[in-house]
C-alpha cells in the first residue's frame, strides 16, 4: 500500500516504523502545519489519520474528495458522523477510538459481560482509565466507547458521568473516572461491584505498537470497500 500519514506525532511515528517494517510505502506525511488537500493525495492508496479533533473533519473531507480510503484514529469528532456518512460513497472510511486488536477483543468481552450483568441488578458497573500525564483529553475516547457499550446493554444505566460528582450519584448513572500520571500508554478497567464480590475486567497497553499494528491491519481490510466502518466490522 502507498500510505499517507496525516498527523505525525507519537502515533504517526509508530505507524511509520511498523509500516516500513512490513514493506508498506509511506508516500506522504502531513505534520500539524501542513494542510491536507485532495491534490496532495493523488499518489496514495490510503490515508491513516491521527491528528487533532479540530483538523480531522477537514482531513476526512479531503480524502473523500480525492476518493481515497481513510483510517481515522482521532477522536472528538463523532458528532459530525451523520454528515460524513452522507458523503462517503466512492471510497472507504474506518474509524475507531482504539485500534489495538487486544482492545477490540476487550470491547467484545465487555459487551458479553454487560449483557449478563443486565440480568443482575446487584452489580453496579464503573470504568476507570489511566494514561500518561501528557494526554490532553479526559476521559479517553476508549473509555467513552466502553461507557457506550455498558449503557447500551445495561438497562438500569441511562447516562454517563465523567467528572467528579457533585454529591451522590444517581443509581442510573455510570461513573467514568480518569488518572493522568507517569508514562502509562493506557489502562482501562471495567468493574462490576456488589455487596458480595467484585469483578474487574482490565486491558493494559504495553506500548503504542499494538495501536500501530491494528491501524495497519484496518487499512489492509478497508482496501476495496466503500462506505463507513468501525473495528466491529473487521475480522479479528
Residue positions per predicted region:
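C-terminal substrate-binding/catalytic lobe of Rossmann-fold NAD(P)-dependent oxidoreductases
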Residues: 2, 10-39, 121-236
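Short, acidic/turn-prone active-site loops that include or flank metal/cofactor-
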Residues: 32-35, 75-78, 98-99
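Rossmann-like NAD(P)H-binding beta-loop-alpha module
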Residues: 105-117, 122, 138
Amino acid at each position: 500500500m502507498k500510505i499517507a500519514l496525516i498527523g505525525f506525532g507519537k502515533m504517526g511515528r509508530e505507524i511509520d516504523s511498523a509500516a516500513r517494517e512490513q514493506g508498506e510505502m509511506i508516500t506522504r506525511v502531513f505534520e500539524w502545519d501542513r494542510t491536507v488537500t485532495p491534490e496532495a493525495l493523488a499518489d496514495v492508496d490510503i490515508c491513516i489519520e491521527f491528528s487533532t479533533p479540530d483538523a480531522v473533519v477537514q482531513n476526512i473531507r479531503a480524502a473523500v474528495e480525492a476518493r481515497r480510503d481513510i483510517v481515522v484514529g482521532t477522536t472528538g469528532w463523532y458528532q459530525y458522523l451523520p454528515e460524513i456518512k452522507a458523503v462517503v460513497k466512492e471510497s472507504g472510511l474506518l474509524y475507531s477510538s482504539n485500534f489495538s486488536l487486544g482492545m477490540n477483543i476487550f470491547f467484545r468481552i465487555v459487551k458479553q459481560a454487560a449483557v449478563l450483568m443486565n440480568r443482575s441488578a446487584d452489580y453496579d458497573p464503573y470504568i476507570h482509565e489511566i494514561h500518561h500525564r501528557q494526554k490532553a483529553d479526559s476521559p479517553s475516547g476508549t473509555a467513552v466507547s466502553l461507557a457506550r457499550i455498558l449503557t447500551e446493554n445495561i438497562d438500569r444505566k441511562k447516562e454517563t458521568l465523567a467528572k467528579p460528582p457533585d454529591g451522590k450519584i444517581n443509581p442510573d448513572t455510570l461513573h467514568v473516572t480518569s488518572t493522568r500520571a507517569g508514562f502509562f500508554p493506557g489502562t482501562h478497567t471495567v468493574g462490576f461491584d456488589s455487596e458480595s464480590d467484585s469483578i474487574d475486567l482490565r486491558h493494559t497497553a504495553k506500548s503504542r505498537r499494538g495501536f500501530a499494528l491494528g491501524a495497519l491491519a484496518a487499512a489492509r481490510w478497508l482496501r476495496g470497500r466503500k462506505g463507513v466502518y468501525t473495528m466491529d466490522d473487521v475480522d479479528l
